[in-house]
Amino acid sequence: MKVFVTGATGYIGTAVVAELMKNGHEVVGLCRSKEGAEKLTKAGAQALKGSLEDLESLERGAKNADGVIHLGFIHDFANFGSSLTTDVKAVQTMTNALKDTGKPFVSTAHAGGSASDEIVMESAKNGVRGSIIALGRSVHGDGDKGFVPQLIRIAHQKGFSAFVGDGANRWPAIHRLDAAKLFRLALESAPAGTYFRGTADEGIPFRDIAEMIGKKLNLPVQSITKDDAQAHFGFLGALASYDMPEPSKETREILHWQPEHPSLLKDLESGSYFN
């Protein structure tokens, strides 16, 4: 299958490109820069110059492909509304390009991106095999620059690793290589109009994460109140407090997906986070 991938040079995208090619697919990745194009060609993929705002390139990439995996997003949180608008237009353009073809369109769910999600779900009525994957809060592994590295940085700065209350609130996670396989399986076999939760760890007690960080940094671990969470964790205050279990039983059953890579706690213990 010839697959058009947005976000192909990103943290998850590079793993998805490798997973697709390893399983016999041909990949065309959207890229904005010469460096991105070189990264793709070095991996054995083709590069299509463009951006998420370049609707002509998105339409061409989708029309010339047998399927699309949409991972790209403009992470400009100072202009988040604009980023969401760009995503809606991009998703609309690509799903329109696949109309009445029966071809797959797999998108990652974005926080606050319900309008894009609705377009993907509606595309099932227009002859597109649209599906959405909502990944766990932490997509961990080598090269992670997300929430967990921020928790480690905060513990360094504060001199202790913290959890809120009794720390029983749960944090879902998935290894980036397991996520890559999940996107491939959805591309190959997801029914139209399906929404999947992509979690290997469906809910790790936040206290366990804090204790592992404290252990690896040789720092004390202590509880803080919910009122103090924002001051301690900054923008992560709410996420560090919420109970967010995300079961993936249906995902595993429908897509025959089984996580194979280290859990978040094992990755923290033996991975690259503290090198």
Predicted stretch roles:
Residues 3-25:
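N-terminal Rossmann NAD(P)H-binding glycine-rich loop of SDR-like oxidoreductase domains
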Residues 143-150, 163-190, 194:
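Substrate-positioning beta->alpha
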Residues 14, 29-92:
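NAD(P)H-binding glycine-rich loop region in Rossmannoid oxidoreductase-like domains
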Residues 26-28, 68, 74-119, 131:
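Conserved Rossmann-fold NAD(P)-dependent oxidoreductase catalytic core, especially the SDR/UDP-sugar
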Residues 2, 182-236:
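Mid/C-terminal beta-alpha module of Rossmann-like enzyme folds, strongest
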Residues 50, 237-275:
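C-terminal amphipathic/interface module of NAD(P)-dependent oxidoreductases
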Residues 118-142, 147-154, 162:
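Conserved beta-loop-beta element that borders a ligand/cofactor-binding pocket
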Residues 127, 152-164, 219-223, 227:
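A short C-terminal helix-loop "cap" of Rossmann-like NAD(P)-dependent dehydrogenase/epimerase domains
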